[in-house]
Structures are given as C-alpha cells and as structure tokens.
Amino acid sequence: MKLKIKDQLPDTEIFQLVDGEPQKSKLSEIIGNGKVVLFGLPGAFTSTCSKLHLPGFVANADKIKAKGIEQIFCLSVNDPYVMNGWGEINNTTGKIKMLSDPYLLFTKAIGAEVDRNAKGMGIRSNRYLIVIENFTVVNIHVEKETKECGLT
C-alpha cells in the first residue's frame, strides 16, 4: 500500500449507479469534505466479503456514524451494476454507498492491487479501511491477506 497517513487521496474517476445508470465522477465529488470511511475489498459476492466484511459494516453503520463519521463508502473493482446489486441484497441503502473502480484507477494509485489470476479472479483490490477527513488520510488499516478481515 503506497497510501500513508496525512496523504491526500488520489482523485481518480470512480463509478456508481445513479437512477439505474452508471455515473462516472471524480472521487472528491463523491465523498466531498468531512469525515468519512472508505473500505475496499476484493469483490462483490466473494466469500469473506459477503460473509464478514460488508455485513459487518452494515450491522455497525450506526455505531460508526455515531463516532463522527458522516458517510461510509464500499469500493471494489466490480462494475457499478454488480456493486449496486450486491448492496441491495445486503441492505446498504441509507448506510453505505457502493462505489466501483472497474479500471483499477484508484486501486492502483494507492498500491492496493493484488493478483488473483490463479483463482480465476484477475487483478483485484486488497482489503483495506481508510478514515478520511477533508480528502486527507487520517487512519489506514490494510489486511495482509485478502481472506483476512480482522483489521478492516
């Protein structure tokens, strides 16, 4: 992971589904200013992501926001339709905004890409959590392995 505390986030293009259509925006336009959490994971519908990571954030979203976090974002390298559908299945509406990095622009800019070709998954994102305030990294946690979900 190249990203460090006090770094500005790379302002890459990210996708989200808006009114049923993919919308491309700069990350700064999506997360804005204020204090937010952005967590990244290898892929929608994958085992650890679906059984632990996303459900953990859904279950604890109110507690996280009670600590001064204004918004929570989930980012993966899947397309925006998949991220939206996965979010709907996991009841993220009003709790977590689902973001898509299909070209790995953000993922590569922060050094979070991992090769999962041997498992038929291609290049994916490592599992991480970033606390951001006014587009600056305040805290960051990165898992050593994508199957782990203890720090993030």
Task: Describe each model-derived feature in a short phrase.
Residues 1-152:
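Chalcogenol-based redox active-site neighborhoods
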